[in-house]
Structures are given as C-alpha cells and as structure tokens.
C-alpha cells in the first residue's frame, strides 16, 4: 500500500522565505502566524552587537556578539547580510541558513529591502521574496496610530520611511496587498506550499521517477 504522504517524503532542498514590508503593513503578524502553523518553517536568528535586554535568550532572540566578534564574522564571509541600525549591527549568519537548506528545512527572514538585496546577491536560487503592501497610506497611518506605541512625530517618520520602502516593491518575487489579514496570510501560505513543490527544489524526484519507471506492474 502506498503511503498517503509519499510526496512529502521526497527529498527536497529548503527555501529562504523573505518577508518585507513597511512598519504597520502586517508583516510581523503574518510571520508569527506562519511560524505557529508550520513546523517546517523556522525563524532565522540574527547576530547583533546590541546589549541583551532583560528576558532575551542567547540563540533564541539573537546571537549576541561583541563588535570585535561581529567584525571577525563579517570579514570571514560568515554573514549573508548585515546592516548598522542606530549604532548597533545586525546580520544573518551564513552557517545555520546553509545547513537548514541542505537538510530540507525552510527559514523565514523578517528583513528590510536592503537585507533582501544582500541575501539575493549570495543565495538567489534559494530565495522566495514577498513584499507586503498596505491597502492605502491612510490605512497604514491608522494602523500605526492604533498600535499606540509612537508619538505623532515618530508616526510621520515611519510613514516617510514607508514610502521609501514601498519604492522597492518591484524587487520582490511576490507582492501582496494586506487589506484583510486572513486572506493575506492564506496567500503567503499558498506561495510557500507552491514553492516547496518546485522541481528544482526537489532533487529526490530524480530517484523517485527513476524507480517509478522501473517498477513492474505485474
């Protein structure tokens, strides 16, 4: 009897799912829902030079490193992408990503367009990039206000930055307008399912098809 989940057992290479959006467009919520609903997807843990905060755990929230350690990683090409933000450095470590891909595990990257560009320069064939847009700038402002996290001046700065980020939408493989969170999540989930089935990500298909053609039916 052929097992019902035979297709999922065919060996495949993992993928790197890149999610980007301006602040308030829903990226973090969609990413969290993906991680909670899909055990085959794991969040890429960044390296940072910023000090650890109270409840943060090494290797779970970040890999905390000194500036000297960070520079050593950068200079030895151990980072896939990096950026300096407010005086602290953040980066994606190469080794965990490459290991996950080889083992058929998928990694989620919650990064901006600059980080996405750097990842594509080094790992283009493995990347599935999705940009999430708000339905309108007015709605984006309303969402930022509803979060009640920032002063008005900060919100205006976020909106200005959002326009700059949105300018890069054409650099992504897929673009989703998040006017309904459930629908946007379903669309992202559908992209992940389809991309996992791409022939070039499933090297195990060669052995499977070879065995299929050699199989005797009598």
From Swiss-Prot:
Pfam families hit by this protein: Guanylate_kin (PF00625)
GO cellular component, one term: cytosol
Gene Ontology molecular function, alphabetical: ATP binding; guanylate kinase activity
Guanylate kinase-like domain residues: 14-193
Location relative to the cell: Cytoplasm
Residues that bind ATP: 21-28
EC number: 2.7.4.8
Source species, domain of life: Bacteria
Keyword Cell membrane: no
Reactions catalysed according to its record: GMP + ATP = GDP + ADP
Record-linked InterPro entries: GK/Ca_channel_bsu (IPR008145), Guanylate_kin-like_dom (IPR008144), Guanylate_kinase (IPR017665), Guanylate_kinase_CS (IPR020590), P-loop_NTPase (IPR027417)
Predominant subcellular localization, coarse grouping: cytoplasm
Endoplasmic reticulum in keyword set: no
Top enzyme class: transferase
SMART domains, alphabetized: GuKc (SM00072)
Alphabetical UniProt keywords: ATP-binding, Cytoplasm, Kinase, Nucleotide-binding, Transferase
Functional description taken from the UniProt entry: Essential for recycling GMP and indirectly, cGMP.
NCBIfam families membership: guanyl_kin
Record family assignment: Belongs to the guanylate kinase family.
Protein name as it appears in the record: Guanylate kinase
């Amino acid at each position: 009897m052929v097992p019902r989940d035979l297709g999922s057992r065919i060996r495949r290479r993992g993928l790197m799912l890149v999610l980007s959006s301006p602040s308030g467009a829903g990226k973090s919520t969609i990413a969290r829902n993906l991680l909670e609903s899909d055990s085959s997807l794991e969040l890429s843990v960044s390296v940072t030079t910023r000090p650890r905060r109270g409840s943060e755990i090494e290797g779970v929230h970040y890999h905390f490193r000194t500036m000297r350690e960070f520079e050593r990683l950068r200079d030895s090409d151990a980072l896939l992408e990096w950026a300096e933000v407010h005086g602290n450095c953040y980066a994606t470590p190469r080794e965990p990503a490459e290991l996950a891909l080889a083992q058929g595990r998928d990694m989620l990257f919650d990064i901006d367009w600059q980080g996405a560009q750097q990842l594509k320069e080094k790992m283009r064939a493995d990347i599935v990039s999705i940009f999430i847009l708000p339905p309108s700038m007015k709605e984006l402002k309303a969402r930022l206000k509803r979060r009640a996290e920032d002063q008005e001046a900060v919100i205006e700065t976020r909106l200005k930055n959002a326009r700059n980020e949105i300018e890069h939408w054409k650099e992504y493989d897929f673009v989703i307008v998040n006017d309904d969170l459930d629908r946007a999540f379903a669309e992202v989930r559908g992209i992940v399912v389809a991309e996992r089935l791409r022939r070039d990500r499933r090297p195990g298909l060669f052995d499977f098809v070879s065995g299929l053609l050699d199989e005797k039916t009598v």
